[in-house]
Regions:
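Lectin-type carbohydrate-recognition ectodomains
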Residues: 2-188
């Protein structure tokens, strides 16, 4: 009789525990015009490339610096395979390879609601960052809703010039031996 009570209490406590969603989404920011994109791939994100374009304008009677910078394109690497380039490969390229057990846990930056994503910062769980563009206009900050999640994919829109909107999708990666190791291991 006592064991029936213990089992019943155990099952009731299991049902009372909140079930944590393994995925979350940070809503897209930006103008949102152009061709939609969704990055995807097998395994963890192991590398990132971001292209930024900086425009400086000169006027007739005086020098005027316009800090009109924007993200022209980006690319994610899943395992050893690079995704297509979303946007275009124009301007200056910034690149970051992730270490083993390193993951992107925050996406932040600035956007101009009239045109492009102007600044993009990707931060890892090791505290490393990749920063592209110039910080001006409206801020955004994306991070996972659940502990232990990491960036799984980016979505949004781009046109022939740059990225017009961006959103982040977070989740768990269930893989044995996931990482960015290129070394060969031998067993004895």
């Amino acid at each position: 009789m006592f064991s029936i009570v213990v089992v019943t209490v155990f099952l009731a406590s299991c049902l009372a525990m909140p079930i944590q969603e393994p995925y979350s989404y940070s809503s897209a920011v930006g103008q949102g015009l152009g061709t939609p994109f969704v990055s995807s791939g097998e395994g963890r994100i192991t590398g990132v490339r971001v292209w930024e374009t900086n425009n400086n304008y000169y006027y007739y009677y005086y020098y005027y610096y316009n800090s009109n910078a924007y993200i022209s394109g980006f690319q994610l690497r899943y395992g050893y395979t690079w995704s297509p380039v979303f946007g275009r490969e124009g301007g200056v390229k910034q690149e970051m390879e992730l270490f083993n057990d390193e993951a992107i846990v925050e996406v932040s930056g600035k956007y101009n609601p009239a045109d492009y994503i102007g600044h993009l910062v990707l931060t890892t769980n090791n505290g490393r960052t990749l920063s592209a563009g110039l910080p001006s206009q409206i801020s955004f900050n994306f991070y996972p809703a659940n502990m232990g999640n990491e960036l799984r994919l980016l979505s949004g829109r781009f046109n022939g010039v740059g990225i017009t909107s961006i959103g982040a999708h977070w989740g768990l990666v269930y893989m044995e031996g996931a990482g960015n190791s290129t070394g060969n291991s031998t067993s004895s």
